[in-house]
Design a protein with these regions (language model features):
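Extended beta-strand/beta-hairpin segments
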Residues: 2-97, 109-310, 321-405
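Alpha-helical metal-binding/catalytic segments enriched in His/Glu/Asp
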Residues: 99-103, 315-316
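Metal-dependent nuclease catalytic cores in nucleic-acid-processing enzymes
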Residues: 104-109, 318
Length: 405
């Protein structure tokens, strides 16, 4: 049983820092060499490093860097279900957008390798997650359900050829082994500037880099033009209904979450993705995604791997903040430095060259007067309730449907 403690009344109410900053929600970082942060090393696959910090309420921002592409600053918020300001997409949006973009990349690569001309292509992806148990008793657990992928395709070949095209594309995507295998996440923990042992989670045996909180505060971010991300439909806060206002802060829960994305490719090659949050009740956003030069794109927007990596970091951090809020404990600042790796299989090979994904490695930084034991509980419960760490640790299958158009 976890003991609750009331937060002192003097603690400031959350404020919409993303709106107040005046910065674009997403933007490419200009002059990345000025950042006091170490970029991921080049190697097999696409290594992605995320530095993220909490802002106010459920708002977070991150700098995400791939060894192959541009450095991006991304931001996330939550809707009325977590008493957020709804100023930016929710964490789960980033993973769904990255996944559907990755599937689109793989499908186009396989079609190109086989010299198949596609007239029309739209992907519709559905991600569902579960949350059950009590936060106060330490039994609340996040889960991930099989991914649904509908391929709407116009192409002048037979059904067998289309089916093989889609199956091969799914196989060579980095998501193939992310979903089919169990990946155990590893963590380190720094509390108030001092590294301490973790609790139940697996230990990350590597030196923790500098606290992202300090790194963010050391420079004013130089930016290029912000990548357009627009809200297509704003949610209306509703109380007393499933998925409505404040419902995700209840201490006992049994619910299913549903995120959908529709992905199309523009004439310039950039992918345009409409992300919908059906449960809990959330807003609809439009994302853009593009791969790096030399990887099939021009780097005009964040790539698939960057979105997926940012989603994991943002979702885990939401669980840290949510857990502290439910328990009424003080957690004024928190951040992560996270490493992930994704590798796409060979689209032109007749051999089995499945895409691969590495485990998530996360250095966690907490500033709290509650002590190291509470900090360890936060990390344990953060991993236990994080939907996207559940996605990594749960073997799943992609449920594919094909619609000829």
């Amino acid at each position: 049983m976890v003991t609750q403690r009331h937060i002192p009344a003097a603690q400031a109410d959350p404020e919409d820092l993303l709106k107040r900053s005046g910065l674009p929600t997403f933007f490419a970082v200009n002059q990345p060499e000025t950042l006091p942060l170490v970029r991921p090393a080049r190697g097999p696959g696409q290594h992605v490093r995320v530095w993220a910090r909490s802002l106010s309420g459920m708002q977070k921002e991150c700098i995400v860097a791939s060894a192959l592409g541009t450095i991006w600053r991304l931001a996330s918020d939550e809707g009325p279900y977590l008493d957020g300001f709804d100023a930016a997409p929710c964490p789960l949006a980033f993973m769904t957008v990255g996944m559907v973009s990755s599937y689109m990349n793989s499908l186009l690569a396989v079609a190109n390798a086989r010299e198949l001309a596609i007239r029309h292509l739209t992907l519709v992806q559905d991600n569902r997650y579960t949350m059950e148990g009590s936060a106060l008793q330490g039994t609340m657990t996040g889960g991930a359900l099989p991914v649904g992928l509908e391929v709407q395709i116009g192409i002048d070949v037979g059904d067998d050829v289309v089916a093989d095209l889609v199956q091969t594309a799914v196989c060579v995507s980095p998501l193939e082994r992310l979903l089919r295998e169990r990946h155990a996440s590893r963590f380190s923990l720094t509390v108030d500037g001092r590294e301490v042992p973790v609790g139940r989670v697996e230990t990350l045996d590597s030196c923790a880099p500098p606290d992202p909180q300090r790194a963010f505060s050391q420079f004013a971010l130089p930016v290029t033009t912000g990548v357009p991300i627009s809200r297509l439909a704003a949610v209306t806060p509703v109380a007393g209904v499933a998925g409505g206002a404040h419902t995700s802060l209840q201490s006992k829960q049994r619910r299913t979450l549903h995120v959908r994305a529709l992905c199309r490719r523009r004439h310039d090659g950039v992918k345009e993705i409409e992300q919908q949050l059906h449960s809990p009740l959330g807003s609809t956003f439009q994302f853009l995604s593009d791969e790096a030069p030399g990887q099939g794109g021009l780097g005009a927007a964040p790539d698939a791997a960057s979105y997926m990596a940012a989603g994991v970091a943002f979702c885990f951090m939401t669980q840290l903040g949510r857990y502290a809020t439910i328990l009424k404990r003080e957690l004024p600042k928190y951040g992560v430095a996270q490493d992930t790796c994704y590798s796409r299989g060979d689209a032109s090979s007749a051999e089995d060259t499945s895409g691969t994904t590495g485990a998530v490695k996360t250095h966690v930084y907490l500033d709290t007067p509650e002590g190291a034991e509470f900090a360890r509980d936060c990390v344990d419960m953060g991993e236990q309730t994080c939907f996207l760490h559940a996605l990594y640790r749960t073997p799943l299958e992609t449920m594919i449907s094909i619609t000829r158009v």
